[in-house]
Amino acid sequence: MFYKGIKVLSLFFIDEVDHYRKYDESGNPVNGIFADMFEQEYEDVLQNLQLKIGEDDYLKYLQSISAEKTHAGYFSIDKKGRMINSKIKRSETSSDDVDAYDLIMKNKELLLDRNPQKSPVRFIFSHSALREGWDNPNVFQICTLKQSSS
C-alpha cells in the first residue's frame, strides 16, 4: 500500500487503559505493558524485516519513525489530563469516549498524512469501540488485546 500512496493504520482495542498508559508518582505518563510489548516487537520486526528489491523507500520510511512515536492512545481524559477508561452502560454499545472520538475525527487528515515528521502514528490503541462515523478507510487491521490471568 505504501507505493500506492496509502498510509495503513492498525487499531488495537484494549481492556484497560493502564495496560497502555500509566502514571508515575509525579503524574508523568509511562508505558503500560501493551505499549512496552508493542515497542519491543516493533523494533524486532524492523530489525529483521526482509524486503524485496526496490523497497528501499519503504524501509527508509519505517526507519524514520521511532517505535515510541508510531503508536498513540486515544482515550477519555480526566480533569488532570490523564487517560482513563471509558464508561460503557449496559444498554449502550458505544462509550462516553468523547475526547478520543473528537481527537480522531478532528485530526483525520493529519492522521492520514504520510509525512513521518508531521504524522508518525500508524498504530492506534483505544479502550472501547469508536462511535459511528469514524469510517477511516485506511484501517486495515483491527484487533483486541486483553491480558489473560492464566
Regions found by a protein language model. Give the residues of each.
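Catalytic or ion-translocation cores adjacent to nucleophile or general acid/base/metal-coordination motifs
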Residues: 140-150
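Conserved C-terminal RecA-like helicase domain
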Residues: 1-124, 132, 148-149
